[in-house]
From Swiss-Prot:
Belongs to the glycosyltransferase 43 family. It comes from Arabidopsis thaliana. Residues 37-351 are lumenal. GO terms for cellular component: Golgi apparatus; Golgi membrane. The lineage of its organism: Eukaryota, Viridiplantae, Streptophyta, Embryophyta, Tracheophyta. Residues 80-107 are annotated as: Disordered. It catalyses: [(1->4)-beta-D-xylan](n) + UDP-alpha-D-xylose = [(1->4)-beta-D-xylan](n+1) + UDP + H(+). This is Beta-1,4-xylosyltransferase IRX9.
């Protein structure tokens, strides 16, 4: 009995030893596959969650996709300063950047705003073609680059007032319509009255621009409205007179060299003693400030008859001050940019 008990105890001891050895072997085997360090399951979980929250955010670009010489230089300076910062080099870089920016500002094209063109159009009451010619003039002025102000002067009429006003509103042109009620027996008196009304309106509101009188039977080269914006005080140009019954063209206007006026083309001379040549109302333009600020151009501020007959005053000033009169176009004053038509009607059209 004693030998059997001893053999059983020895067998149990061996079993325990084998079990302990197996457990130690398994733990050592799996421990060898584990990474070196203090990472744990929880630390791995935190790292994974942090990366997942940051990954959807796209990287921010350093600069725009458009590159210039100035931007590339700035990038090089930033990299060099980050690698080896030095106060002297940073100051030199700032000086170079400022000089480059100043050069770029100088090279930029300076855009100057266009001056206002004020077109005055009187309408003859008895002209049977006035609606057609008014629409044709509107189609021409619509092609002129802004700013442009169209002042239309006509006699008040209940029947035709609505039609002309509606037509002017549909043109898309900035306009002002002036009406009068006076009756005139002379065509020239009616036209002068309408022009004086327009000039008083310009003077009262101090509209600053270049004033041009455009008759309804005028035909324009669109370059004409570009050239008159260059007028400082007074400007003049040649004008061609056309007639349906005559096979010839008569030219009126200045004779000039470059932009200097030397003489005038005269259609006819009624009085040889007349020293001042006649000038057509549509063959000159002037700065509107001569009306409400004459002292700016060396003219007296108060002249008798100026308020009553402004158109006569303007013509007188244009012909008297030759030094401020500029021929257009400046390069070739003989170029025709304005034509005036005469229609074969019993009613005389605007002049």
């Amino acid at each position: 009995m004693g030998s059997l008990e001893r053999s059983k105890k020895k067998a149990q001891v061996w079993k325990k030893a084998v079990i302990h050895f197996s457990l130690c072997f398994v733990m050592g085997f799996f421990t060898g596959f584990a990474p070196a360090g203090k990472a744990s399951f929880f630390s791995n979980f935190e790292t994974t969650s942090y990366t997942s929250t940051k990954s959807p955010i796209p990287p921010q670009p350093f600069e725009n996709a458009t590159y210039t010489q100035h931007s590339l230089l700035n990038r090089t300076l930033i990299n060099s300063q980050s690698q080896a910062p030095a106060p002297a080099e940073s100051r030199e870089a700032e000086g170079e950047t400022r000089s480059l920016s100043e050069k770029e500002d100088e090279n930029q094209v300076k855009v100057t705003p266009r001056g206002l063109v004020i077109v005055v159009t009187p309408i003859i009451t008895k002209d049977r073609y006035k609606n057609v010619l008014l629409r044709r003039m509107a189609n021409t002025l619509r092609l002129v680059p802004p700013p442009l102000l169209w002042i239309v002067v006509e006699k008040h009429s209940d029947g035709e007032e609505k039609s002309s006003s509606t037509m002017l509103r549909k043109t898309g042109i900035m306009y002002r319509r002036i009406v009068f009620k006076e009756d005139f027996t002379s065509l020239e008196s009616e036209l002068d009255h309408q022009r004086n009304l327009a000039l008083r309106h310009i003077e009262h509101h101090k509209l600053s621009g270049i004033v041009h009188f455009a008759g309804l039977n005028n035909i324009y080269d669109l370059d004409f409205f570009v050239k008159i914006r260059d007028i400082e005080v007074f400007g003049t140009w040649p004008m061609a007179l056309l007639s349906a019954n005559r096979k010839r063209v008569v030219v009126e206007g200045p004779v000039c060299e470059s932009s200097q006026v030397l003489g005038w083309h005269l259609r006819k001379i009624n009085n040889e003693t007349e020293t001042k040549p006649p000038i057509h109302i549509s063959s000159f333009a002037f700065n509107s400030s001569i009306l409400w600020d004459p002292e700016r151009w060396g003219r007296p501020s108060s002249v008798e008859g100026t308020k009553q007959d402004s158109i006569k005053y303007v013509k007188q000033v244009v012909l008297e001050d030759d030094t401020k009169l500029k021929g257009l176009p400046a390069q070739d004053c003989s170029k025709i940019m304005l034509w005036r038509l005469k229609f074969p009607t019993r009613t005389r059209l605007s002049t």
